[in-house]
Amino acid sequence: SILAAMAILGLVDTLIPLLAERFGLWQFHATRSALVLAALLAGAAALGWRLRPRRWRGVAARSVMIAAAMTVYFACLASFSIAQAVAGLFSAPVWVVLVTALVLRRRVGAVAWAAAAAGFAGVLMSLGFLGGGAEVSAAALLPMAAGLFYGVGQIGTREWCAGEGPMTLLFGFFLVIGVVACAGLALVSLLPEAVRLEAPAQAGFVLRGWQAPDATFAAVVAAQAAGSLVGVGLIVRGYQLAEASFVSVFEYTLLLFASLWAWALFGQGVTAAQGAGIALILASAALAARFGTAQRPAPAA
């Protein structure tokens, strides 16, 4: 079920560039959040899902971190290849180790440091900083910002949200990112039209306001909403059926599935350096899981 979840999430994330030229990031997040929140409320009414958190502050803080991560991640999908965006997101375990050791002042074993270093090298290779050959700008580090926020959110899941159910966390995340998206729409509407029109194509995805939806927008957003719900459900089921340290490794196959979907749908390949980077990230995840130091990456919502 984990592999099926990663295949679904990889597919729906690959569709984002279809929206980037005509629609905006904030419109996408606001619409998707509305659909998912409606589905969660319907599920709570029909199936008894618990959406109310036991610890409001913890769930709110965690939701803010994950919302920040997903805002940066989806913005990157319009400017970077899918492999680069996902690799940046999966720098989260590196940040988890650093924050745990340097901020929380907790002991981190040598294997965890080695796995984090290998994963970090893999991310840098995927982003073109190692072995790419071509000149790379500092902007290529942006996907790693998503990983930083995601890593803090992972720590928050464990430290602040113990005992909270997956539907509660999902509801909190989509509620927060929906509010952020509405605020984003309001802010970009205040920008002079000349600024929005003269922005580069990639920046336009972030600066663009509300546009009249069409069939493509509706299809992509519906697929994203359904994919988020089904993907999370399959992941939860996978963790119920097998040992967490074993299952967590398979979540990193999102890198493979996203790259395969990008190649199949848009002919977007990966370089040799990016392929080696992806392999190194997967190897670091397996190493961490083998010695009980894995940090579950959690689904890209």
Where are these regions (language model features)?
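Transmembrane alpha-helical segments that form core, pore/gating elements
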Residues: 17, 40, 133-196, 211, ...
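Hydrophobic/small/kink-forming positions within alpha-helical transmembrane segments
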Residues: 6-11, 41, 63, 67-71, ...
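Hydrophobic transmembrane alpha-helices of multi-pass small-molecule transport proteins
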Residues: 111-128, 273-292
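Transmembrane alpha-helices of multi-pass small-molecule transport proteins
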Residues: 22-68, 148-156, 172-189
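Loop-to-transmembrane-helix transition segments
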Residues: 1-4, 49-74, 138-144, 195-230
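C-terminal transmembrane-helix exit sites in multi-pass transporters
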Residues: 92-117, 256-274
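Hydrophobic/aromatic residues within transmembrane alpha-helices
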Residues: 19, 28, 76, 82, ...
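Helix-helix packing/entry segments at the starts of transmembrane helices
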Residues: 86-91, 160-176, 229-263
